[in-house]
């Protein structure tokens, strides 16, 4: 625990205590300055005006603002590059997906044509004999589509 004096000393090293001390110091300095300026005015002396901001301070401020703006621009550029990358990846995925869907559609159509052709070629009469009409049509189609027979 400790004595009251020890507790008081411990409080001096806390953040809150230091903040209060700084605030007290600032208010004391402003009060003293105000009283001093008032006394000067009462005695008839010229009261010094507030010092204009020096060029160095302004240039430092301008440099800081320029750096902040530059940093913001760089950040915006990075964000834009990220957006473009995401957009490109999304477009690439959509393109791949569309190509895959197209391949699936083509293979289904090809399978359906094969099934239809097989069905036509395996048709039979009532007595079980194969029909020759569809077979002849199929051969004729093959001849028409083959490049060796057409010039």
From Swiss-Prot:
Coiled-coil residue spans: 70-113
GO biological process per UniProt: maturation of SSU-rRNA; maturation of SSU-rRNA from tricistronic rRNA transcript (SSU-rRNA, 5.8S rRNA, LSU-rRNA)
Basic and acidic residues composition bias: residue spans: 89-115, 135-151
Keyword Ion transport: no
Keyword terms: Coiled coil, Nucleus, rRNA processing
One of the record's GO cellular component terms: small-subunit processome
Note: Present with 1460 molecules/cell in log phase SD medium.
Protein's recorded name: rRNA-processing protein FYV7
Gene of this entry: FYV7
């Amino acid at each position: 625990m400790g004595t009251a004096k020890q507790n008081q000393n411990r409080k001096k090293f806390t953040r809150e205590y230091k903040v209060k001390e700084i605030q007290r110091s600032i208010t004391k300095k402003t009060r003293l300055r105000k009283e001093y300026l008032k006394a000067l005015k009462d005695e008839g002396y010229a009261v010094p005006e507030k010092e204009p901001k020096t060029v160095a301070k302004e240039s430092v401020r301008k440099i800081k603002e320029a750096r902040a703006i530059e940093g913001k621009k760089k950040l915006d550029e990075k964000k834009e590059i990220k957006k473009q990358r995401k957009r490109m990846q999304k477009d690439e995925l959509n393109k791949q997906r569309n190509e895959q869907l197209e391949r699936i559609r083509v293979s289904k159509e090809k399978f359906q044509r094969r099934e239809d052709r097989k069905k036509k070629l395996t048709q039979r009469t009532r007595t079980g004999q194969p029909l020759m009409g569809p077979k002849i049509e199929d051969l004729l189609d093959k001849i028409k589509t083959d490049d060796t027979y057409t010039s």
